[in-house]
């Protein structure tokens, strides 16, 4: 309300008071009415906060940055931090004289995310494996069991070509954005044969001659 100067008489109306686009002579009742009107004054929060920027899995606890969040206007609750890649839900509740644009002070839910980290390369066989009559498995470059699970044919005995598969775990994705299994070929080479000859293992037969 606005109080304006009036006449010099101390016994009459000394000021005018206006509120809610109305104007009347000052009185105790009007002052109280103005105070009551101000007591129910509300301030509107124009937008519910939203996640600003992106988060990527690091293995550590992270919290999002919020666009439109002011702790003097609202409280934050729900899930406000996380470790694993995925979607979480925070809540925002107006405090004091603040309300949402719908006039309520009810908590509003807002989703936020932590994205999967990237696995840049599909594992590949490193080194060679040669047939030895026993089951063998290859060594893999770029393979980390915390990032990828291995499947398909992981070991074999005979010489030949085989196919293993690699699938990102829940916090990882391939560089193309996919999370499905990718195949990787690996081989067991043929062993090199050898023949050992000794004098005791040989016998020679000569044809009989007449004469």
Q: PLM ranges: what are they?
A:
Residues 41-211:
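Solvent-exposed beta-strand/loop surfaces, strongest in extracytoplasmic domains of secreted
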């Amino acid at each position: 309300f606005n109080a304006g100067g009036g006449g010099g008489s101390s016994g009459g109306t000394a000021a005018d008071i206006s509120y809610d686009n109305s104007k009347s002579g000052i009185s105790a009742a009007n002052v109280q009415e103005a105070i009551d009107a101000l007591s129910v004054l509300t301030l509107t929060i124009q937008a519910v906060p939203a996640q600003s920027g992106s988060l990527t899995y690091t293995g550590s606890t992270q919290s999002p940055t919020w666009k439109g969040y002011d702790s003097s206007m609202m409280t934050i609750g729900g899930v406000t931090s996380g470790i694993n890649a995925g979607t979480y839900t925070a809540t925002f509740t107006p405090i004091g004289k603040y309300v949402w644009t719908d006039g309520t002070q009810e908590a509003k839910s807002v989703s936020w995310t932590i994205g999967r980290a990237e696995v840049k390369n599909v594992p590949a066989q490193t080194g060679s494996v040669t047939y030895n009559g026993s089951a063998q498995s290859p060594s893999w470059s770029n393979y980390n069991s915390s990032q990828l699970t291995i499947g398909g044919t992981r070991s074999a005995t005979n010489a030949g070509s085989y196919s293993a598969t690699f699938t990102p775990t829940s916090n990882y994705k391939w560089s193309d954005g996919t999370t499905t299994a990718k195949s990787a070929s690996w081989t067991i080479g043929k062993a090199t044969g050898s023949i050992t000859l000794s004098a005791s293992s040989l016998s020679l037969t000569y044809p009989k001659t007449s004469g």
